[in-house]
Design a protein with these regions (language model features):
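Flexible "arm" and connector segments at domain edges
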Residues: 1-91, 95-132
Length: 132
């Protein structure tokens, strides 16, 4: 699809409240994830949905995450019969739609995410107190 795979593992902060789920594919990159989404979508005649449909899907998935976070940490308790949702799966649903949207638009998220990390480092690297 877009460039060689990066074999380095994921980088980021540690778990906040719940331990991370084990990755389906250890060390998967955004490029590899985009390829996996492309392979899955390419199996179907309909192919990629239009950008505005994917935006609606993204908003729907973010709404599901917001609902769960509101139940856990906000002022809206769940109904007794309503089960807890898996936050990791809710986030992965959002990621899937983002990957599909990036693919449909021809965007290499590995490259763009590296640019965003650099942007944050330059813009915000001295904004907060560093850990010692």
């Amino acid at each position: 699809m877009r460039g060689p795979d990066d074999t380095s593992g994921p980088v980021g902060p540690g778990p906040a409240e719940e331990p991370p789920s084990p990755p389906a594919r250890p060390g998967i990159t955004l490029t590899a994830a985009q390829r996996a989404v492309d392979a899955w979508i390419s199996r179907f005649e309909e192919g990629y949905w239009p950008p505005l449909t994917n935006l609606a899907r993204l908003v729907e998935e973010v709404g599901e995450l917001a609902r769960e976070l509101n139940h856990r940490y906000g002022h809206k308790p769940k109904k007794a019969e309503e089960p807890d949702q898996d936050l990791g799966l809710e986030l992965a649903d959002i990621l899937f739609v983002l990957l599909a949207l990036a693919n449909e638009q021809g965007i290499d998220l590995d490259a763009r995410f590296a640019e965003v990390l650099e942007k944050y480092e330059v813009r915000d690297g001295e904004r907060w107190t560093r850990r010692r």
